[in-house]
């Protein structure tokens, strides 16, 4: 059985998807970009966008009854892999050890 997770503290879905779906004990969170949930606009600057992504994920986790520190894997998509170290620094600030598994990819563009 699956349960759709939605919170007003994260950006509403802008396509044919849910913010997250809880299936048994697993929470599947849709990809996030640095959208402010109140304005639905991207925040400015790479670091602020990244921090906003983690705020959005945290809000979704909270709505599902868990914490961002319960996440077991992140897939990080970057349009410029030179920002990878900044992502590491931000993750170190917002996550507790032990850190989750992670994969990072450089992509040509991200949707909005």
How would you name each of these model-derived features?
Residues 1-112:
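Short, polar/acidic, helix-capping and beta-turn segments at strand->helix junctions
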């Amino acid at each position: 059985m699956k349960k759709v997770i939605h919170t007003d503290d994260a950006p509403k879905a802008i396509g044919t998807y849910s913010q997250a779906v809880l299936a048994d004990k697993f929470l599947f969170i849709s990809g996030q970009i640095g959208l402010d949930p109140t304005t639905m606009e991207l925040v400015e600057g790479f670091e602020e966008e990244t921090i906003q992504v983690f705020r959005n994920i945290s809000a979704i986790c909270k709505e599902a009854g868990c914490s961002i520190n319960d996440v077991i894997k992140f897939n990080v998509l970057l349009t410029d892999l030179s920002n990878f170290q900044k992502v590491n620094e931000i993750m170190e600030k917002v996550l507790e050890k032990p850190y989750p598994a992670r994969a990072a990819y450089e992509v040509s563009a991200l949707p909005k």
